[in-house]
Amino acid sequence: MRKIEREMIQAIIDRSYFKKANTKVTVVVPKGADSKAEMRVYLHDNHIATYTDDGQLFVNHCGWETVTTKSRLNSLINFVADPTKNGIYQKNYKWFITRNGVDYQMPQGWHQV
């Protein structure tokens, strides 16, 4: 895991704003009594992940199927889920997401881990 990814995850743990180079973490508290805070992760100003107060992680490559995007998303997945059964990988130029040991093709859009 890269240093910037460790710092990104620490910001999520601390529930604090973080910005370094091309990576940013923000805290969003929606209005409403039952609303839960979210930690949002951005890469080059693209919203690539949301981590909720109840431990849910949603990921999105935003059309940027790059090594850096995959690395940021995998570090988040490893933070919240078993890395031996969950993650993102590329095969024959296509992205796949593994959830609980099952592989799925990963089209653009949001995916819950």
Regions found by a protein language model. Name each.
Residues 1-113:
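Terminal leader/tail segments of proteins
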